[in-house]
């Protein structure tokens, strides 16, 4: 795959309580990804940039929340997140983890 495309696939890590528990217990990491990214592209990007073996990728399309801005009602953008399961013995050291 094109390296330029792989740079655009991963938007960043998704940090939440659930993501932290999954990273510790099930060796799964959660990433925000491009809305048009495929499972294969996500797997290739994680393997290339973090130098780990990926065993599976699950993808979820998240609907944007409705929010109020003063008296106006607006909507956040829809986005996509990926649950990446690493092979046994593999680990990703993200900032803030020990």
UniProtKB/Swiss-Prot annotation:
Keywords: Ribonucleoprotein, Ribosomal protein, RNA-binding, rRNA-binding. Gene3D superfamilies: 3.30.70.330. Transmembrane segments: none annotated. GO terms for molecular function: rRNA binding; structural constituent of ribosome. This is Large ribosomal subunit protein uL23. Belongs to the universal ribosomal protein uL23 family. Part of the 50S ribosomal subunit. Contacts protein L29, and trigger factor when it is bound to the ribosome. Pfam families: Ribosomal_L23. One of the early assembly proteins it binds 23S rRNA. One of the proteins that surrounds the polypeptide exit tunnel on the outside of the ribosome. Forms the main docking site for trigger factor binding to the ribosome. It comes from the Bacteria. The keyword rRNA-binding applies. HAMAP family: Ribosomal_uL23_B. The gene is rplW. One of its GO terms (biological process) is translation. GO terms for cellular component: ribonucleoprotein complex; ribosome.
